[in-house]
A protein has these predicted regions:
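Retroelement reverse transcriptase polymerase core
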Residues: 1-189
Length: 189
């Protein structure tokens, strides 16, 4: 188990889902190939021989660039639901009374901080025109990814009552600048 004790599980029913590779425009092919080369280099993904395969989906980012990701809809249909609680935004409002200094912490590739359980790695396979790849770290788009990430953040931020975690956003709320510096120091230690 990793130091934080959280691994992503994908409990499924039925047979492995399988898809064919989708054709890509030359631009999307280049972006996708570069992204998967980077994911492999970083140890986030690896080449696969899995019986599972979800199609590659390339979506536009807000800045107009392309984001390659797995289209896990068919896998998600046969994945059992994780009932770990996800907070609702209005659950935080009472705790924010009297707070006037805020910082929002954005985790870069936060979902990739969570390893996929070794038994479930083959289920994350994505078929591309340049090969089959599976994820060693949790990719975006999986059913229960939000629950796994919330579980991680609840574990990491346990005891920090000034930290409010909602999905991959962390809000630090304080009553003064001096207190805020202490809160940020405690969070990052």
């Amino acid at each position: 188990l990793p130091k934080h004790g959280v691994q992503h599980r994908i409990p499924t029913t039925g047979f492995p889902v399988h898809s064919q590779a989708r054709r890509l425009s030359p631009e999307k092919f280049k972006v996708s190939k570069e992204e998967f080369d980077t994911l492999v280099k970083l140890g986030i993904a690896r080449r696969s021989n899995s019986q599972f395969s979800s199609p590659l989906h390339v979506v536009p980012k807000p800045n107009g660039e392309w984001r390659p990701c797995g289209d896990f809809r068919r896998l998600n249909e046969c994945t059992e639901f994780d009932r770990y609680p996800i907070p609702r935004i209005h659950d935080f409002t009472a705790n924010l009374a009297g707070k006037c200094i805020f910082s929002k912490v954005d985790l870069i590739k936060g979902y990739h901080q969570i390893p996929v359980h070794p038994d479930d790695v083959p289920k994350t396979a994505v078929i591309t025109p340049f090969g089959l790849f599976e994820f060693l770290r949790m990719p975006m788009g999986l059913k229960n990814a939000a629950q796994a990430f919330q579980r991680l953040m609840d574990s990491v931020c346990a005891g920090l009552d000034f930290v409010f975690v909602y999905l991959d956003d962390i809000l630090v709320a304080s009553e003064s600048e001096e207190e805020h510096v202490k809160h940020l120091t405690a969070l990052f230690d």
